[in-house]
């Protein structure tokens, strides 16, 4: 009786694994090169990275991306907005305009973040913190396997107060668009996808990737909230 139960469990697992393999064969995975072509002008080398932080950047160079010698730090929060449920290659993301929540009115002073090196450590170049400046540090955020690019840089305000404790340090933000894979969703490959990626697909279906908008903060500024 016990052996029959064990056999039933084994057969069930084999069936599940077989189904997963069939799904993988049925739904083709887009290559990094194809995703980079779909992302197109939305890729900003100052704020995004395809490769893990600290690794050589040859892969990015092969994809046609080259990092700027002067990279602005920024921060990405956890809020993300799906700007479209259609395939990313079918949507002109530059034409999509989202209404942003109005931020509190603020009066800001001229600010500058502390200089940082590539790995997020402050540079010791005789830098002296000024009263109207907010010190900050850079972190890397891993968005996970379902995002492209996967890695984005973030800045965290270290100081809470500025201008002799009369003003507050506040991150200044804007938005970037990245690709997000909708897990469990496949879509038929069409001529437009083939034209953009120039990829030869062996399957008729591929994974569905959509545009997602993420708010990022690129600096810390000294402000007085009303």
From Swiss-Prot:
It is found in: Secreted. Its main location: secreted. Keywords: Developmental protein, Secreted, Signal. Residues 1-19 form the signal peptide. Required for activity of the tor receptor, could be a ligand of tor. Involved in specifying terminal body pattern. Belongs to the noggin family. This is Protein trunk. The gene is trk.
């Amino acid at each position: 009786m016990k052996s029959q139960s064990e056999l039933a469990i084994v057969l069930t697992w084999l069936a599940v694994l077989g189904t997963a393999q069939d799904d993988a064969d049925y739904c083709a995975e887009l290559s990094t090169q194809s995703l980079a072509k779909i992302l197109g002008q939305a890729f900003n080398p100052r704020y995004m990275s395809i490769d893990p932080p600290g690794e050589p950047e040859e892969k990015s160079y092969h994809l046609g991306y080259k990092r700027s010698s002067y990279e602005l730090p920024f921060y990405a929060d956890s809020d993300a907005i799906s700007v479209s449920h259609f395939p990313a290659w079918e949507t002109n993301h530059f034409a999509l305009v989202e209404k942003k929540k109005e931020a509190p009115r603020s009066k800001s002073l001229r600010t500058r973040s502390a200089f940082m090196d590539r790995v997020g450590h402050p540079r010791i170049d005789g830098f002296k913190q000024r009263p109207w400046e907010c010190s900050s540090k850079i972190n890397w955020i891993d968005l996970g396997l379902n995002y492209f690019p996967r890695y984005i840089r973030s800045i965290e305000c270290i100081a809470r107060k500025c201008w002799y404790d009369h003003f507050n340090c506040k991150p200044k933000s804007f938005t970037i668009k990245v690709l997000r894979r909708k897990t469990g969703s496949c879509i038929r490959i069409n001529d437009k996808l083939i034209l953009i990626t120039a990829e030869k697909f062996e399957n008729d279906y591929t994974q569905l990737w959509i545009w997602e908008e993420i708010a990022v903060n690129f600096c810390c500024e000294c402000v007085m909230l009303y």
